[in-house]
From Swiss-Prot:
It comes from Porphyra purpurea. GO terms for cellular component: chloroplast; cytosolic large ribosomal subunit. It holds the Pfam family Ribosomal_L3. PANTHER family: 50S RIBOSOMAL PROTEIN L3, LARGE RIBOSOMAL SUBUNIT PROTEIN UL3C. InterPro entries: Ribosomal_uL3, Ribosomal_uL3_bac/org-type, Ribosomal_uL3_CS, Transl_B-barrel_sf. This is Large ribosomal subunit protein uL3c. The gene is rpl3. It is found in: Plastid, Chloroplast. HAMAP family: Ribosomal_uL3_B.
Amino acid sequence: MSVGILGTKVGMTQFFDETGLSIPVTVIQVGPCVITQIKSMSTDGYNAIQVGYKQVVEQKLSKPLLGHLKKSQSPPLKYLREYLVESIEDFEVSQVFSTNIFEVGQKVNVSSKSIGKGFSGYQKRHHFSRGPMSHGSKNHRQPGSIGAGTTPGRVYPGKNMAGQMGNKKVTIKNLQIVSINIENDLLLLKGAVPGKQGALVKVSK
């Protein structure tokens, strides 16, 4: 598994390249992320690193979490994520990740929780076609048939129906890095990224 870096979605804007072409980009505030723990094959049975992000006041964290962070002399961090690695030799506790691990033109994968739309119907959630709106029709926004009769006598699992829409983890792959602002730890990614403004985002190579 590749090591990811955590960040916050700032919003969308446009970026003009050398030819004057307008490119829609998503601005992400990445890092700084701190390694809070290193797990090895000898002590834990697998190699992994634990990364923390977003410093907060101590009152917002539980005492067990604060005790865990103080073992590595880490600041109070709100988010902790673990990543499997083949070797732990290249990492050390308190090592900091930021925009310095990325390059302009590089393609990355971005994961975040999509915007929740609540309980949504067939047309909005699955893009079903609606029925006739006049001429005596009573089937306007209904799903139509959802299965057969006595055989099989049930609705098959996975049938597209109304229900909760959004609020799920979504990963967009191969988004190109258009620009990097090292001073403010900002990444400008070409295209859209899941989630609302302020959402927690994971960027991985």
